[in-house]
């Protein structure tokens, strides 16, 4: 999941 801008609990 790299290169995009959305936040999902990591």
Swiss-Prot record:
Glycan-bearing residues: 1
PTM per Swiss-Prot/TrEMBL: S-linked glycan consists of Glc-Glc-Glc trisaccharide.
Record's keyword terms, sorted: Glycoprotein
Name used for this protein in its record: Erythrocyte membrane glycopeptide
Origin: domain of life: Eukaryota
Organism the protein comes from: Homo sapiens
Keyword Glycoprotein listed: yes
